[in-house]
Swiss-Prot record:
Residues 1-15 form the signal peptide. It comes from Haemophilus influenzae (strain ATCC 51907 / DSM 11121 / KW20 / Rd). Keywords: Cell outer membrane, Cell wall biogenesis/degradation, Lipoprotein, Lyase, Membrane, Palmitate, Signal. This is Membrane-bound lytic murein transglycosylase C. GO terms for molecular function: hydrolase activity, acting on glycosyl bonds; peptidoglycan lytic transglycosylase activity. PANTHER family: MEMBRANE-BOUND LYTIC MUREIN TRANSGLYCOSYLASE C, SOLUBLE LYTIC MUREIN TRANSGLYCOSYLASE-RELATED. A lipid is attached at C16 (S-diacylglycerol cysteine). Its EC number is 4.2.2.n1. A lipid is attached at C16 (N-palmitoyl cysteine). CDD domains: LT_MltC_MltE.
Length: 357
């Protein structure tokens, strides 16, 4: 697990250090900076190992917000998948109080935030977690007064301790999110989703289903494969295709993709490319939707090769099948277990959003 999490750091650290260089050749730059990345990764890992001990490395991911503060002695972890917030420190309770307030009032703008530095995330007048967490009195946490009072309550009434393997003592609080926290986050992005859906002719429920599966509507999302933001757009693959479609050179930067409007537009643009270019020959709309979902995860080429190595023959075979057959093959025969499960998850999520519309 630790090795996997370290791999997740590599592309993110690289992307952060080059976020202003749109149009950069990703492959050449990545190879060129490998030594520097090893140093950065080693430093981060060393800090966490030294302070927290073995098997304690937590880093930001697709559905997890993780932020270290106080020279890495305090950290906040928001699990957008499980709907739980854990804030813990090895320092005094004032540090814990401060971390609780800053976490509850952090904004939705990930563009200028370095999740791998140890500074506080700025307090926002429009907290991203607003409506997803309530305090001990059932109030929404909308400002610093409410957040501070709730932090005091948590420390006085809900404080827990645990012992690390290195002998250090950690004090922490755990805060559950409300039951429908996923839907609350989804609603924040509905105007942008509807705009992109209308512009590119893509079903809103499909966009919502993909976004939930990719990031659980976490605007800070980052993956080990360098997929960024709400729709987990990979700059040097899907991002490059989208820029080419728009007549732009190069690829989107990390900063560009951490803007929710840009990210949703890029993700839906890529769905349009899959629908109208790479998978254009598939005639049944349901079969095409299944192929698009699978291709969003594994690529159109990988999807077509499940049916035949020749693209035209693969499309012909798909067109001879019922949609249910296409679905069964993509969820059982596709060589990637991730892709097989991805179609199952997105299809289920899309159906849920169709019902709720």
């Amino acid at each position: 697990m630790k090795k996997y999490l370290l791999l997740a750091l590599l592309p993110f650290l690289y992307a952060c250090s080059n976020s202003s260089n749109q149009g950069i050749n990703y492959d050449e730059a990545f190879a060129k900076d490998t030594q520097g990345l090893d140093i950065l990764t080693g430093q981060f890992s060393h800090n966490i190992d030294r302070i927290w001990g073995v098997n304690e490395l937590l880093v930001a991911s697709r559905k997890d917000y993780v932020k270290y503060t106080d020279s890495f002695y305090t950290r906040s972890h928001v699990s957008f998948d499980e709907g739980n917030i854990v804030i813990e420190t090895q320092q005094d309770l004032n540090r814990l109080h401060n971390a609780i307030v800053h976490t509850l009032l952090m904004g939705a703008d990930a563009k200028g935030i370095d999740l791998f530095a140890s500074g506080d995330v700025p307090i926002s007048s429009r907290p991203f977690l607003l409506g997803q967490v309530v305090d001990h009195q059932g109030q929404h946490i909308a400002n610093q007064v409410i957040a501070s009072n709730f932090a005091t309550y948590l420390i006085q009434n809900k404080l827990q301790t645990r012992r690390l393997q290195n002998g250090h003592t950690v004090q922490f609080v755990s805060v559950p999110m409300i039951a429908n926290h996923v839907e609350v986050r989804a609603r924040k992005y509905l105007p942008l989703i509807r705009k992109a859906a209308q512009r590119y002719g893509i079903d809103e429920s499909l966009i919502l289903g993909i976004m939930q599966t990719e990031s659980s509507f976490n605007p800070y999302a980052i993956s080990y494969a360098n997929a960024i933001g709400l729709m987990q757009v990979v700059p040097h693959t899907a991002g490059r295709d989208v820029f080419a479609m728009k007549g732009k050179g190069g690829q989107p930067s990390t900063r560009y993709l951490y803007d929710p409007a840009n990210n949703i537009d890029a993700g839906v643009s890529y769905l349009w490319i899959l629908q109208n270019q790479y998978l254009d020959g598939i005639t049944n709309p349901t079969s095409k939707r299944f192929a698009m979902i699978s291709a969003y995860n594994s690529g159109a080429g990988a999807v077509l090769r499940v049916f035949d190595n020749d693209k035209d023959t693969a499309i012909y075979k798909i067109n001879q099948m019922y949609p249910e057959q296409v679905y069964r093959i993509l969820t059982t025969v596709h060589p990637s277990s991730q892709a097989r499960n991805y179609l199952l998850k997105v299809d289920k999520a899309q159906k849920k959003f169709r019902v709720r519309r």
